C-alpha cells in the first residue's frame, strides 16, 4: 500500500492538517512525513514554546538523536547563525547552521533538559548571538522563505505548522527510527502515532492545505 492509502484512516489531507494544528496548540507532538520519492521518512515535531524535558527525552530515545531546531531566516540572522558549510552539496540541500549550546543554565549540554534550555534560549525573540556558545549539541536549521511551497522539506513543514497553528515560528524535529536503528517508514510511523497520540500528516497534505486556503506565510 502507498502512503496515501495507509493514511486514509486519519481522514483527508485537510482533516489531517487540522488535527495536527490542534495537537500542536495543545502541546502535543505530530508526525510529519515527506514525499515517498524524497527521504520517505517521518519526523516527530514539537512546538518550542510548549516543549518539555519529557518530550525531549522521548525524541532522544525514539529518534536518530540529531535533534534540530527549525527557525525562520530572520531568527537565524538575529542569532548570527551562519550555515554549517559554504558549499552545500547534500542531496536535499538541508540548511544546517553551526551547532549551538546555551551559554547559561546548562551543564554538558547533552541532556534532555540542557537541550530544551538551549532550544528555548535560541528561539526567544529577544535572544542575542552572545546568548549562545558554538558548537553545541543542538542543530539549528534555516527554513526557506515560502515554506513548503518553496521547499518540500521537514524544516519548512515545521515552521509552517507553527505559523498555521498561531504559535511562535520555531519547532524541533528529529527523525523517527525503529528499535533496530533503521529508519521508520509509513507503517511504523502510523503505529507510533497511534501509540503516542500523535496525529500523522504529510508535506503534500500541507501543500494542498496552503493552496486551498491561500495561506501566505513568512
Swiss-Prot record:
InterPro entries the record matches: DHBP_synth_RibB-like_a/b_dom (IPR017945), DHBP_synthase_RibB (IPR000422)
Enzyme class: lyase
Presence of the UniProt keyword Protein biosynthesis in the record: no
Highest taxon of the lineage: Bacteria
Binding site for D-ribulose 5-phosphate: 38-39, 43, 151-155, 175
Residues binding Mg(2+) 2, per UniProt: 39, 154
This enzyme's EC code(s): 4.1.99.12
Gene Ontology BP terms: riboflavin biosynthetic process
Binding site for Mg(2+) 1: 39
Cofactor note (record): Binds 2 divalent metal cations per subunit. Magnesium or manganese.
Reactions that this protein is recorded to catalyse: D-ribulose 5-phosphate = (2S)-2-hydroxy-3-oxobutyl phosphate + formate + H(+)
Keyword annotations from UniProtKB, A to Z: Lyase, Magnesium, Manganese, Metal-binding, Riboflavin biosynthesis
GO CC terms of this entry: cytosol
Names of required cofactors: Mg(2+); Mn(2+)
Pfam families referenced in this protein's UniProt entry, alphabetically: DHBP_synthase
Pathway assigned to this chain's UniProt record: Cofactor biosynthesis; riboflavin biosynthesis; 2-hydroxy-3-oxobutyl phosphate from D-ribulose 5-phosphate: step 1/1
Family: Belongs to the DHBP synthase family.
Quaternary structure and interacting proteins, as annotated: Homodimer.
Protein purpose: Catalyzes the conversion of D-ribulose 5-phosphate to formate and 3,4-dihydroxy-2-butanone 4-phosphate.
Record-given protein name: 3,4-dihydroxy-2-butanone 4-phosphate synthase
Species of origin: Vibrio cholerae serotype O1 (strain ATCC 39541 / Classical Ogawa 395 / O395)
Amino acid at each position: 500500500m502507498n502512503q496515501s492509502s495507509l493514511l486514509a484512516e486519519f481522514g483527508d489531507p485537510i482533516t489531517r492538517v487540522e488535527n495536527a494544528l490542534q495537537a500542536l496548540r495543545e502541546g502535543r507532538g505530530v508526525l510529519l512525513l515527506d514525499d515517498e520519492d524524497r527521504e520517505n521518512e517521518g519526523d516527530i515535531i514539537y512546538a518550542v514554546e510548549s516543549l518539555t524535558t519529557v518530550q525531549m527525552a522521548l525524541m532522544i530515545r525514539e529518534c536518530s538523536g540529531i535533534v534540530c531546531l527549525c527557525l525562520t531566516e530572520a531568527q537565524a540572522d538575529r542569532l548570527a547563525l551562519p550555515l554549517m558549510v559554504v558549499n552545500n552539496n547534500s542531496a536535499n540541500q538541508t540548511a544546517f547552521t553551526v551547532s549551538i549550546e546555551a551559554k547559561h543554565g546548562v551543564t554538558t549540554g547533552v541532556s534532555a533538559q540542557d537541550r530544551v534550555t538551549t532550544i528555548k534560549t535560541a528561539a526567544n525573540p529577544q535572544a542575542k548571538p552572545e546568548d549562545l556558545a558554538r558548537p553545541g549539541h543542538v542543530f539549528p536549521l534555516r527554513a526557506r522563505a515560502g515554506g513548503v511551497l518553496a521547499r518540500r522539506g521537514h524544516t519548512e513543514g515545521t515552521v509552517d505548522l507553527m505559523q498555521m497553528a498561531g504559535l511562535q515560528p520555531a519547532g524541533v524535529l528529529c527523525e523517527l527510527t525503529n528499535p533496530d536503528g533503521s529508519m521508520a517508514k509509513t507503517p511504523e510511523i502510523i503505529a507510533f502515532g497511534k501509540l503516542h497520540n500523535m496525529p500523522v500528516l504529510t508535506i503534500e497534505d500541507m501543500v494542498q492545505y496552503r493552496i486551498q486556503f491561500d495561506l501566505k506565510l513568512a
